[in-house]
From Swiss-Prot:
Quaternary structure and partners: Monomer. Binds crRNA and tracrRNA.
The protein's required cofactors: Mg(2+)
Disruption phenotype: Almost no mature crRNA or tracrRNA produced. Loss of CRISPR interference during plasmid transformation.
Comment, domains: Has 2 endonuclease domains. The discontinuous RuvC-like domain cleaves the target DNA noncomplementary to crRNA while the HNH nuclease domain cleaves the target DNA complementary to crRNA.
Organism for this UniProt entry: Neisseria meningitidis serogroup C (strain 8013)
Protein name (record): CRISPR-associated endonuclease Cas9
Matches recorded under Pfam families: HNH_4 (PF13395), RuvC_III (PF18541)
Cross-referenced InterPro entries: Cas9, HNH_CAS9, HNH_nuc, RNaseH_sf, RuvC_III
Entry's Gene Ontology molecular function annotations: DNA binding; endonuclease activity; metal ion binding; RNA binding
Enzyme Commission number, as recorded: 3.1.-.-
Similarity comment: family membership: Belongs to the CRISPR-associated protein Cas9 family. Subtype II-C subfamily.
Length: 1082
């Protein structure tokens, strides 16, 4: 394919960035930057950088599995060293070991032997069994005195068990943990070891150390010859030695260095200076909204609040209001007053300061009435030491020469820190004094370092460089921005540099998984509220034709909140006439033309005549609030007695407001992610537009508003194309377009459409039937065809999915707009990022018995709390234990096949006399097992986990698929067997030199399969190893095609053609892959 070389285009690039997608659109603009035509658009989709169901890091599962493997390996090595020690000290002889180095005929009653060792001499084998058992099960060793105050529930349960057993040993009823286990655990609960999620049988390693010492003493008394000092020292070392936690320099190395002082390490968050910096940032940014104006705190107010967080454990907004003596009409900016008791939320909490103070109080080292008397420098040192070091020993080593022993002991008992900030203590100590004078953080940084972001790279290049991972720590955001960068650079390579870039990021970008779930929860609640409101509307208006629209429902909602009265006149509104055209109107209390505020908090229900009289004035101006007129007082009373939320009342009653500030806030999205990306692009990319501000972050609410006004229908559930729709709107949100809309709304508010009106600013004739300004004529029709390939995007039409069909459709439907058909028009094809990662989980976690693998069967031990009725039918020895089978079945059926509920209470077997006997916790279940991964020296088998690649071969006009798993990659195995339907792996087709290698497939590689019946073109989703069929994902994931956008069970062996394609990040360059040699797995 020849390289695409377009003519020079003056265009705006619009981006709609989500956590798993980037929609993009190019809109050409004229010299005044008015949108004039749609050049190109598309969607890039990728996997979010987290576990979808839990929000966990993708690395967490690997990290936990690696941790378990390390523990297992270290335990095995510890036991090996113990066996070697026993042989070296003469406890055991060479004849006692088998060919694998394991001890022959080792007694299997170690708990009983540990108790017996207190009263009699043990044989060498018995003594070996005891010592090995202590080394294998060596309890829990805490390295911090204050570990019991953890918020980790699992660790808390473990520590509770350790403490309880330590207390039981101190009573003197039991000499050792072994005696306690035999005489208490086994008798009371029937088992000695911990069970699932129960840590009540855990011992402290120090208690086990005491038992070891006592055992050596007793065995020496009984004449055991194998109690030498060397053996005791070696065993005790193996018992007590533990790898130190990552701390000190290792932690600092991982954290990196200061933004402003590159040679300095980042400061601990729980230092005095860092906490004061955080407080000063909040204090200096705090704004009061009062009588319509916004203001910062005065110097006196700042001084009043400055030391309050040190006096109170938590400083709330309500406390701040009282201290500042604010009037009831004053509010804190940024606080969500919609929720109950909003001002009860915390303004500032000095966690470290008060943690240190409480620790000293608990140990009687601080007078409750006096302030903390440790210097700021010493508190910084304490915060740093307790954040960097993870053991009492290391912390003591750092602080022993700085603070008194009794204070250090108190702190070790009660505090633990771990968080860090991005700035060093050195930088903070330079910045904080300026912030204490009232300067904002950015102002203080600019004064000291010259720039808020430290050393800034201002070199402009044609292409955007990589997003710095050290500045964007959230992996979900980093991947989204990195994919956006690929799209930007792809557009520039294809079309040249844009004049401007407009960006909208989805609300969830930059939010934690928990926050995103909260957003989803609120959206679901809002959806249910709308359904209830719609049902209520139909009750009030049973004769209403069709489904009520959001505007109809909003009228009823405002009617109820305003107690059925017009907010401007106070007159009663006739509910029966609510839907009568012109009778009532929804008005923007603060004129939209002056604020661009279309939020619910700016909407009121008024009689049509009152709305016309008000025009584009604020209520304060309309009712002559400046002179405190009677009308203004009555209006205030109506607002105050309404059921509006507090924040809405505040907005409606605004007396003064900054129009430019309102527009700036409502048109721009100032979240950190947007600010970062805008600044990053502006500083590093060469853009051709006029003026300084050439990168703009659009507000999502404005995008929704314009999309609705411009007649663009968006249904998220249908397919992935809708991301491009928003990108078009974002691109068209130019300053020139905003000005047009502002003028239109202003004239409409002023009821200026009386016949013909001349716009004095432009000379444009405005007619009474003038519609909302569009970017260009037939805008909605053109955009919907370009995005969905159908007239108005309606599903009943056939999609114009080829270049010729799309241009023909545009020419037919938009005959009056020939500009819609041009050389850059191409069908939208969603680009999906392929996953070519070759590593992954080696095998599934569950290991099954492989004794009957030759029968095609494996045996799995299934806990009763996970046993379903279908599993029960495959229970091993079902015929030999019919009573057990029937009892389990009855319990499950009684609880509707919910095993968690069915076996919440213990389940027991009963003898012939009906007496309760053994507790049943799990049963063995047969499973079909054709293949898998051998583990545990070929004694167990586990299911295959990740299929990372499928290699495609061809021979005699037939195609053969060879699946490759991550465990094969790890071992460097390149498989040579192709799937044969219904056959075991050993009977699969052997691939030799007579087969031709075609290509390798990874998830989301673009493929084409042509059969006698159909042509399928989409992204490879998966391969079924039992049938050799593949699943193909439709490019836009149209849920009306296949199963939720996926074509399943496509046979490729006898396909007429099977081809892999390459696609760029824009979905524009699609070409067949070139033939290559078969790649290795590593």
């Amino acid at each position: 394919m020849a390289a695409f070389k377009p003519n020079s285009i003056n265009y705006i690039l619009g981006l709609d960035i989500g956590i798993a997608s980037v929609g993009w659109a190019m809109v050409e603009i004229d010299e005044e930057e008015n949108p004039i035509r749609l050049i190109d658009l598309g969607v890039r989709v990728f996997e979010r950088a987290e576990v979808p169901k839990t929000g966990d890091s993708l690395a967490m599962a690997r990290r936990l599995a690696r941790s378990v493997r390390r523990l297992t390996r270290r335990r095995a090595h510890r036991l090996l060293r113990t066996r070697r020690l026993l042989k070296r000290e003469g406890v055991l002889q060479a004849a006692n070991f088998d060919e694998n180095g394991l001890i022959k005929s080792l007694p299997n009653t170690p708990w009983q032997l540990r108790a017996a060792a207190l009263d009699r001499k043990l044989t060498p084998l018995e003594w070996s069994a005891v010592l090995l058992h202590l080394i294998k099960h060596r309890g829990y060793l805490s390295q911090r005195k204050n570990e019991g105050e953890t918020a980790d529930k699992e660790l808390g349960a473990l520590l509770k068990g350790v403490a309880g057993n330590a207390h039981a040993l101190q009573t003197g009823d039991f000499r050792t943990p072994a005696e306690l286990a035999l005489n208490k655990f086994e008798k009371e609960s029937g088992h000695i070891r911990n069970q699932r999620s129960d840590y009540s049988h855990t011992f402290s390693r120090k208690d086990l150390q005491a038992e070891l010492i006592l055992l050596f003493e007793k065995q020496k008394e009984f004449g055991n010859p194998h109690v030498s000092g060397g053996l005791k020292e070696g065993i005790e070392t193996l018992l007590m030695t533990q790898r130190p936690a990552l701390s000190g320099d290792a932690v600092q190395k991982m954290l990196g260095h200061c933004t402003f002082e590159p040679a300095e390490p980042k400061a601990a968050k729980n230092t005095y200076t860092a906490e004061r910096f955080i407080w000063l940032t909040k204090l200096n940014n705090l704004r009061i909204l009062e009588q319509g104006s916004e203001r910062p705190l005065t110097d006196t107010e700042r001084a009043t609040l400055m030391d309050e967080p040190y006096r109170k454990s938590k400083l709330t907004y309500a406390q701040a209001r009282k201290l500042l003596g604010l009037e009831d009409t004053a509010f804190f900016k940024g606080l969500r007053y919609g929720k109950d008791n909003a001002e009860a939320s915390t303004l500032m909490e000095m966690k470290a300061y008060h943690a240190i103070s409480r620790a000293l109080e608990k140990e009687g080292l601080k007078d409750k009435k006096s302030p903390l008397n440790l210097s700021p420098e010493l508190q910084d040192e304490i915060g740093t030491a307790f954040s960097l070091f993870k053991t009492d020993e290391d912390i003591t080593g750092r602080l022993k020469d700085r603070i008194q022993p009794e204070i250090l002991e108190a702190l070790l008992k009660h505090i633990s820190f771990d968080k860090f900030v991005q700035i060093s203590l050195k930088a903070l100590r330079r910045i904080v004094p300026l912030m204490e004078q009232g300067k904002r953080y950015d102002e203080a940084c600019a004064e000291i370092y010259g720039d808020h972001y430290g050393k800034k790279n201002t070199e402009e290049k044609i292409y955007l460089p990589p997003i710095p991972a050290d500045e964007i720590r959230n992996p979900v955001v980093l991947r989204a921005l990195s994919q956006a960068r690929k799209v930007i650079n792809g557009v520039v390579r294809r079309y040249g540099s844009p004049a401007r870039i407009h960006i909208e990021t989805a609300r969830e970008v930059g939010k934690s998984f928990k926050d995103r779930k909260e957003i989803e929860k609120r959206q679901e609640e809002n959806r249910k509220d709308r359904e209830k409101a719609a049902a209520k509307f139909r009750e009030y208006f049973p004769n209403f034709v069709g489904e009520p629209k959001s505007k109809d429902i909003l009228k009823l909602r405002l009617y109820e909140q305003q107690h059925g009265k017009c907010l401007y006149s106070g007159k009663e509104i006739n509910l029966g006439r609510l839907n009568e055209k012109g009778y009532v109107e929804i008005d923007h209390a603060l004129p939209f033309s002056r604020t661009w505020d279309d939020s619910f908090n700016n909407k009121v229900l008024v009689l049509g005549s009152e709305n016309q009289n008000k025009g584009n004035q604020t209520p304060y101006e309309y009712f002559n609030g400046k002179d405190n007129s009677r009308e203004w007082q009555e209006f205030k009373a109506r607002v105050e007695t309404s059921r509006f939320p507090r924040s809405k009342k505040q907005r409606i009653l605004l007396q003064k407001f900054d129009e430019d500030g309102f527009k700036e806030r409502n048109l721009n999205d100032t979240r950190y992610v947007n600010r970062f990306l805008c600044q990053f692009v502006a500083d590093r990319m060469r853009l051709t537009g006029k003026g300084k501000k050439r990168v703009f972050a659009s507000n999502g609410q404005i995008t929704n508003l314009l999309r609705g006004f411009w007649g663009l229908r968006k249904v998220r559930a249908e397919n992935d194309r809708h991301h491009a729709l928003d990108a078009v709107v974002v691109a068209c949100s130019t300053v020139a377009m905003q000005q047009k809309i502002t003028r239109f709304v202003r004239y409409k508010e002023m009821n200026a459409f009386d016949g013909k009106t001349i716009d004095k600013e432009t000379g444009e004739v405005l007619h009474q039937k003038t519609h909302f300004p569009q970017p260009w004529e037939f805008f909605a029709q053109e955009v919907m065809i370009r995005v969905f390939g159908k007239p108005d995007g309606k599903p009943e039409f056939e999609e114009a999915d080829t270049l010729e069909k799309l241009r023909t459709l545009l020419a037919e439907k938009l005959s009056s707009r020939p500009e819609a058909v041009h050389e850059y028009v191409t069908p939208l094809f969603v680009s999906r990022a392929p996953n070519r990662k070759m590593s992954g989980q080696g095998h599934m976690e569950t290991v099954k018995s492989a004794k009957r693998l030759d029968e095609g069967v494996s045996v799995l031990r299934v806990p009763l709390t996970q046993l379903k009725l279908k599993d029960l039918e495959k229970m091993v020895n079902r015929e030999r234990e019919p009573k057990l089978y029937e009892a389990l079945k009855a319990r499950l059926e009684a609880h509707k096949d919910d095993p968690a509920k069915a076996f919440a209470e213990p389940f027991y077997k009963y003898d012939k006399a009906g007496n309760r006997t053994q507790q049943v916790k799990a049963v063995r279940v047969e499973q079909v097992q054709k293949t898998g991964v051998w583990v545990r020296n070929h004694n167990g088998i586990a299911d295959n986990a990740t299929m990372v690649r499928v290699d495609v071969f061809e021979k005699g006009d037939k195609y053969y698929l060879v699946p490759i798993y991550s465990w094969q990659v790890a071992k460097g195995i390149l498989p040579d067997r192709a799937v044969v339907q219904g056959k075991d792996e050993e009977d699969w087709q052997l691939i030799d030199d007579s087969f031709n290698f075609k290509f390798s497939l990874h998830p989301n590689d673009l493929v084409e399969v042509i059969t006698k019946k159909a042509r399928m073109f989409g992204y490879f989703a998966s391969c079924h190893r039992g049938t050799g069929n593949i699943n193909i994902r439709i490019h836009d994931l149209d849920h009306k095609i296949g199963k939720n956008g996926i074509l399943e069970g496509i046979g490729v062996k006898t396909a007429l053609s099977f081809q892999k394609y390459q696609i760029d990040e824009l979905g524009k360059e699609i070409r067949p892959c070139r033939l290559k040699k078969r790649p290795p797995v590593r």
